[in-house]
Amino acid sequence: IGLTWRGQPLLGALAVPALDRPYWAAPGLGAWCNGAPIQVSGCTSLGESLLVTGFAYDRHTRLDNNYAEFAYFTHRTRGVRRGGAAAVDLAFVAQGLLDGYWERGLSPWDLAAGMALVEQAGGVVSAYDGSPADLASGKLIACTPGLQQPLVDGLANCRPLTGASFGAPELDPPTP
């Protein structure tokens, strides 16, 4: 559950019952899990980072699906995971279990609670270009402060600006 004020996340609450992890965050109170304060990891190196992302449900009609980005970061980090739920991925970044997150094609209700968690845990949440995140845009970076610029740069440079190519022929979507 996320509460926003003027388009920005303010409060966040999230439960991951399978792991017995309730999370919550509020301005001035920080971010918490199971009654203990949490914070983002101290990772500052893309090469040492462990990232997480997601993919749109319909890869054949979403040509901006995330394959090029996934390939780019997979070869430049310790690894990239695919968690499945944006809010949980963001909670894991807030807790320092993962170092960074990016994804596109999301709705405000996917992001609001997790954004509040990351920010209150000392992380950075932004648009792909590094500007302030916009819930309505559906795309987001969330990470440690030291990883923001490498993620912004990677997202800007991982695919050709003009073509339909995803950076590697084997990653291009099938033609109908």
Each language-model region and where it sits:
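DPxDG-like acidic metal-binding loop motif
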Residues: I1-W32
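Hydrophobic/proline-rich hinge and linker segments of small-molecule sensing/allosteric domains
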Residues: G30-N34, L51-G54
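An extended, acidic
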Residues: Q39-P176
